[in-house]
Amino acid sequence: MKIKRSFISISVLMVIFGLMISVQFNSLKHPKVRDTRDMWDIREELTSEQKKQEKLLAEINKYDKLLNSYSQTKEMTKETALNNTLQSLKKTAGMTDITGSGIVITISPLFSESLTGEPIENPPPDLLKKLINELNSYGAEHISINERRVVNHTVIRDINGTTKIDGYALDDYPLTVKVLAKDPDMLHSRVKGSGLEDLFASENLALKAGKSESKLTLKAYDRPLDVQQLKLLKD
């Protein structure tokens, strides 16, 4: 399809060349009549025609360079497209570091152990999953919890009484959740207007969200991807 488009573009350029040359040729043709103009008129017309010729040559040179650039980049088009696609997929899959605007959410104990008389528990996995789902529905594009990137196959679960994200323990408060979004203001408003704070408070956890004044950087997902279910497509 791209080769066809390039061919069409070149054809259009050639048509432009033909029209320009035709117009220039017609402008130089004059009927054979007796010239009654004085020398200054002739010189003025000659200068005008020379300028037209120079302009035409400049246009031809410009399109010639354009055609050369097409021929030079045509062979690189497939490789460039594949590379761009690969980088886009890596970005979407969370395999690259990413920097952008967003909000920061902190999760910490609401009341101390001395006040409740009970030990501080890890955040329940289901509660963190609920938070992630809500953030995604509010327009979150990228999320990390304690610098661990959240991707489609991230696993958050309780292992022997400790909440872990992809095998990393979340037992040290406060937890820091970084969230990137196209519209951080709207995301912040949605979080503040939701029932997330009350939901976390029911587990003796304080959830506080604030818009970051500086750019946030989320580290890439650093664990191997499970590709066992992927199959090679046959032609």
From Swiss-Prot:
Keyword tags: Cell membrane, Membrane, Transmembrane, Transmembrane helix
Statement: the UniProt record of this protein carries the keyword Lipoprotein: no
Subcellular location field: Cell membrane
Topology in membrane: Single-pass membrane protein
Residues annotated as transmembrane: 6-26
Short name of any one Pfam family annotated for the protein: DUF881
GO cellular component, one term: plasma membrane
Homology family: Belongs to the UPF0749 family.
Protein name: UPF0749 protein YlxX
Species whose genome carries this gene: Bacillus subtilis (strain 168)
Originating gene: ylxX
